[in-house]
């Protein structure tokens, strides 16, 4: 709305003066898509990348919605965008592991935010194992072979 970003989060979003803003007759706000629409977008990405998992798509959308609500309520400083969900889907097709994909795509956030986002996903998708749990299980399997 012309107020810019002084925290450095968005480069090039300077505060615009009122005379310049007055040249625009309308302002359009683009909210995030509804859960149903966003799920269609995520499913489309999955089809595009050749890895369709409807339950994972539903869980990703639910997870993003909870984070956005928390962001708007002032509880966190970061947000999960639809674009980031697309990145997670793409990473999932590469690594074939949900948590690895999520962890790789939230790695740019600070440690507390990253940990809270990952922890939240494990609550949304109760059947998923964190990378640490997967590693421990793999190590146990290797030890049991010998």
Model feature map: region roles:
Residues 1-146:
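C-terminal regulatory/interaction module of P-loop NTP-utilizing enzymes
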């Amino acid at each position: 709305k012309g107020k810019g970003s002084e925290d450095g989060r968005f480069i090039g979003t300077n505060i615009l003066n009122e005379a310049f803003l007055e040249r625009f007759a309308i302002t359009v706000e683009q909210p995030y898509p509804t859960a149903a629409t966003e799920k269609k977008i995520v499913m489309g990405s999955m089809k595009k990348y050749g890895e369709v998992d409807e339950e994972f798509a539903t869980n990703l959308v639910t997870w993003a919605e909870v984070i956005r609500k928390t962001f708007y309520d002032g509880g966190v400083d970061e947000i999960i965008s639809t674009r980031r969900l697309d990145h997670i889907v793409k990473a999932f097709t590469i690594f074939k592991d949900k948590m690895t994909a999520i962890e790789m795509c939230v790695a740019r956030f600070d440690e507390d935010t990253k940990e809270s986002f990952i922890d939240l996903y494990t609550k949304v998708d109760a059947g998923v194992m964190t990378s640490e749990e997967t590693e421990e299980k793999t190590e146990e399997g290797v030890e049991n072979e010998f």
